[in-house]
Amino acid sequence: MKIWIDADACPRVVKEIVSRASERLKVPVCLVANTDLSRAHTSLVTSVRVKAGFDVADDYIAENAEACDLVITADIPLAARVVEKGGVALDPRGELYTEENVGERLSYRNLMAELRTDGMLLGGPAQLGLTDRNRFASALDRLLTKMVREHRPQ
């Protein structure tokens, strides 16, 4: 079991929350980005630097994450790929992507992108607030506790 973080756009506070949970539960983490994240390394946290380019980090995660892994991402197309493979994906606001909701979230994302392209909508999602951080930390704790119980040998 491993935690993968789509680290290019992941808020620093989310990476810190994941790092603390990783240390507590002894679950390895891999940050994937097109920038150097080696200073974030600990005994359980590593990073992979990919080439700059559209969806390169997403492709790396989708190809390397396994069904027993957790992927932290705000990228809905990546989450859809992970869920399709049988993996688990969580967004930085603590919302779990599931087979039941990922298609709807992908459609909504595409609609919003189209509205922004047409100039009918400005900006993106709101900045991560304290409520979002707390929701993420709680969701991560519940999810990791369950996953560790299921995937660690007794």
From Swiss-Prot:
CDD domains: PIN_YqxD-like
Superkingdom of source: Bacteria
Record family assignment: Belongs to the UPF0178 family.
Classification via PANTHER family: UPF0178 PROTEIN YAII
Official protein name in the record: UPF0178 protein GM21_2006
Organism: Geobacter sp. (strain M21)
